[in-house]
A protein has these predicted regions:
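Acidic, surface-exposed loops and disordered segments
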Residues: 1-210
Length: 210
């Protein structure tokens, strides 16, 4: 927004501090094993302090400002990953940052109007894993207007994903009928989503964005 660079990055290298961060990411081993953990934050604190020190009246304690800063932070994070990987580094996104934001806020001592958005681990990779399966490009592209998905299109677009040996095994070991049930019933349940939504909203209020 307005070239304000509404993001900050907290670099965690210290082993003890990585250990403190780990529970916020459900103790995924990569948090403590990677040389560096980077937490990308939506940051309107810096801009607000600039305004206050320049006889200006900031008005960024609201949800729209959070969305603008979160967008900035994610764009910067992905750009950083692209550049890092071009230099031979490996990155891995942790999808847990917005699940327990308050504990990350407390651990990293984030002030008001700063909110954790994305976390990556960074280092030189010692392996080259295969890329995860992706939906076909035509499943995400809509020409001119949004075209909703018929049952036939869903069958077409998810056929490859549902029929990889890994995913078929995933369904079997979880005693489910379909891969979708693994996601809705086990991995990302309505109950968990609602509970985590509540804690995330509370953290947004605590940080001054609501």
């Amino acid at each position: 927004m307005g070239n304000l660079q509404l993001y900050s990055v907290v670099i965690t290298r210290d082993a003890e501090k990585k250990a403190l961060l780990a529970p916020s990411h459900f103790n995924q081993p990569m948090v403590t094993e990677a040389p560096v953990v980077l937490t990308f934050c939506a940051d309107f604190n810096r801009t607000t302090q600039w305004a206050l020190n320049r006889k200006a009246t900031p008005g960024y304690d609201n949800f729209l400002s959070f969305l603008n800063a979160a967008t900035d932070a994610l764009l910067y994070c992905q750009t950083f990953c692209n550049l890092a990987e071009a230099e031979g580094l490996g990155t891995c996104f942790l999808g847990t940052t917005i699940y327990q934001p308050q504990s990350i806020i407390d651990t990293l001592q984030l002030p008001r109007l700063v909110f954790p958005i994305a976390t990556i681990t960074l280092g030189y990779p010692d392996e080259d894993p295969a890329q995860c399966e992706r939906l076909p490009l035509e499943s995400i592209i809509h020409e001119e207007t949004y075209t909703d998905y018929s049952a036939a299109l869903i069958d077409c677009f998810y056929h490859e994903k549902e029929n990889t040996p890994e995913n078929k095994h995933f369904v079997e070991i979880n005693n489910k009928e379909t891969l979708a049930q693994v996601f809705t019933d086990l991995r990302y349940t309505k109950r968990d989503n609602e509970a985590l939504s509540k804690t995330t909203l509370e953290a947004l209020k605590q940080q001054g964005f609501l």
